A protein has these predicted regions:
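C-terminal motif of bacterial Sec signal peptides marking the signal peptidase cleavage site
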Residues: 21-24
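N-terminal secretory signal peptides that target proteins for export/translocation
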Residues: 1-9
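Post-signal peptide N-terminal segment of mature Sec-exported envelope proteins
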Residues: 32-52
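Sec/Tat-exported extracytoplasmic proteins
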Residues: 61-68, 82-85, 121-128, 144-151, ...
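Gly/Gly-Pro-rich "capping" loops immediately C-terminal to redox-active cysteine motifs
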Residues: 42-43, 69-118, 192-227
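Flexible coil segments in periplasmic/lumen-exposed cytochrome c-class electron-transfer proteins
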Residues: 26-38, 75, 100-101, 107, ...
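Sequence/structural segment immediately N-terminal to covalent heme-attachment motifs in c-type
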Residues: 49-85, 166-197, 215-217
């Protein structure tokens, strides 16, 4: 059974009163690709082995738990955060193939795209890594390449998307009200999820090391994509408050999380201590 955790870094940013953990595998660390609105469509998936790999990769990403049960430790799938099969602008996979390898501060190394995928399996899926040279990883990366058709290779610029959230202070009581009014109908009153929406806290959700466990990352995702039936209707403060409320609940721990950001300077909304920032 997963260990539930409510890690807190003492003395950090006021919003992190008891924040625990979209993986999600979110894209907080990546620049927005210019081609996000023009993802390649089904009509141009070719016949033959390449097209078969594209379709299988998409199937693995949209039915991750059913397709790869040995590697998924919760009730999420990759497209729980990367909506519209990875085509939605906030969380898009369009262009991601062209941005790797890239240096990422969380690991402190230059990551390949296979490493990044496996990081999501460990964190957002609370599971285990795929064989980086195996057929499952090959087909997932092939789908990314297909979506990135026509996107030029360029260095990944540091993202500025999360900077605006630095000015916000969370009110988790207000977040609870937003959750009850706008989120519980899909995600459950206790965050347990429903048949059509993933759990957002508890043993079956993403773990404390997932990108979505960061309040700023979650607020950015929520502000663009939620509620699912009326995206973009929440005010920024409401998105921030509900992100803090969701992440104030227990969720699975991540072994080795203290080794994140090995060169220091973790983002201020990381809810757990690291070896370089206790």
């Amino acid at each position: 059974m997963p260990v539930l955790s409510r890690p807190v870094r003492p003395g950090t940013w006021s919003v992190l009163l008891s924040v625990a953990c979209l993986a999600a595998c979110s894209r907080a660390d990546s620049a927005k690709p210019a081609a996000a609105a023009s993802a390649a469509t089904d009509s141009i998936i070719p016949a033959g082995p390449y097209g078969d790999a594209v379709r299988r990769g998409r199937a693995l990403l949209t039915a991750t738990r059913d397709s790869l049960p040995a590697h998924v430790g919760n009730k999420l799938r990759c497209t729980s955060c990367h909506l519209d099969e990875g085509r939605r602008e906030s969380g898009t996979w369009v262009g991601v193939f062209a941005r790797y390898p890239q240096y990422r501060p969380r690991s402190g190394i230059v990551e390949t795209i296979e490493y990044r995928v496996n990081d999501c399996f460990r964190r957002s899926m609370n599971g285990t890594a795929l064989d980086p040279a195996g057929p499952d990883m090959r087909d997932i990366v092939t789908y990314f390449a297909f979506l990135s058709h026509g996107v030029g290779v360029s260095p990944s610029a540091p993202s500025t998307r999360l900077q605006k959230w630095a000015a916000f202070t969370a009110d988790t009581a207000a977040g609870a009200r937003v959750y009850a009014a706008s989120c519980a109908k899909c995600h459950g009153s206790a965050g347990e999820g429903t048949a059509g929406a993933p759990p957002v806290w508890g043993a079956a959700s993403y773990n404390v090391g997932a990108g979505m466990s960061r309040v700023r990352t979650a607020a950015e995702f929520i502000s663009h994509n939620m509620p699912f039936d009326a995206p973009g209707t929440l005010k920024d403060q409401e998105s921030f408050d509900v992100a803090a409320y969701v992440n104030a609940h227990p969720r699975p721990d991540l072994r080795g999380k203290e080794k994140d950001w090995p060169h220091g300077d973790p983002p201020p909304d990381v809810a757990y201590p690291t070896q370089t920032h206790p």
